[in-house]
Amino acid sequence: SYPVDDDSIRPRRLIAYGGHGICMGFWGVTDGEAGHMVILETADDAAVRIDRTAGRLVAAPEWDAQKGALGYPRRLRYVFFDRGGHVAMCKRYRAYAKSVGRFRTLAEKRKACPAVDRLVGAVNVWCWDRDAVGLVREMQAAGIRRILWSHRRPPDQVKALNAMPGVLTSRYDIYQDVMNPANFTHLRGVHSDWPTAMWPDGLNLDARGDWRRGWRVHGKDGTMYPCGVLCDLLAPALARRRIAEDLKGHPYRCRFIDTTTASPWRECYHPDHPMTRTDSRKAKMDLLRVVSGEFGLVCGSETGHDAAVPVAHYFEGMLSLGPYRVPDAGRDMARI
């Protein structure tokens, strides 16, 4: 929240269809008691514009096109309050979320996935130390009892970690980026999660018919090589195959799916798998549902969006003060 006269806040546009915009489809203005809020009831192609009028912040809705047209009836709801301030707004949006099926507590999710108990209160550890079991023992001896181990390990270590009380085993996974195999010789390594077979027919195409650029990788020659973005419609089937094979030898109880709730819902113009942003959202949620529903795993994703509340258990980055990694976050230890 920001005071309307805070001149450090620059005008901006926040999409409602991705984690790096507004993660819940509402905003409001209050004097501490009275105020109003706006609920975006058709949020898949919507955004909020934050600007200044007479030196004060104002917010207004914007509608993005669906495949170049309005596409469908757009709907938003204004709600006015005489008391309650931001708490009343949050309660009102909570009621709306319940009415559209987006409200699901961890207690409810625990009934379907008992491993959720190991998630609650756990520190999220990303560590590339080879002796994961020894490090976890050391952490627990130091008083850190509940640990989400997020880096993939060999089967024997996963099994040993599973046998330790308070430990939730997980690994990284991603269903967005596909590198052109013609670039492999220029790279320092080939990511094991790139679904190379999806190049080029599985790529998301923009309105010009060009493949969308995703994550970029440093090449040995200093050039940045972009991945293509996989069409979201193809991700759930890919995940079913990959996760089923992985779990045969690696009994993880959790899986972190990168980018799914951080990247925006995207249109695709490929003739074999066209989609609107609404289709994209549904496919992304289907992907997470494969993890949590079909395989019964604790499911995490990046940044977070309330569309994923029914199918995900946690988000990385939701509590960060800024998007992405801040310059002095500590990961770049050679520089800091």
Q: Model-predicted segments: where are they?
A:
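Carbohydrate-recognition beta-sandwich/jelly-roll modules
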Residues: S1-M179, R253-C254, L288-V291, V298-C299
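Glycine-rich loops and low-complexity Gly/Arg-rich segments
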Residues: G85, G101-F103, W194-A197, D279-K282, ...
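Short, low-complexity, polar/charged sequence segments that are solvent-exposed and flexible
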Residues: A97-S99, L168, R188-S192, P274-R277, ...
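The substrate-binding groove and active-site-proximal loops of carbohydrate-active enzymes
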Residues: R118-D129, A142-H151, W215-R240, W265-S280
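Short glycine-aromatic motifs
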Residues: A141, N162, P195, P310-V311
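Active-site-adjacent "subsite" loops/lids of carbohydrate-active enzymes
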Residues: R171-E245, D328-I336
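Substrate-binding cleft/loops of secretory-pathway carbohydrate-active enzymes
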Residues: P181-G189, W265-C268, G300-I336
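Active-site neighborhood of glycoside hydrolase catalytic domains
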Residues: C231-T303
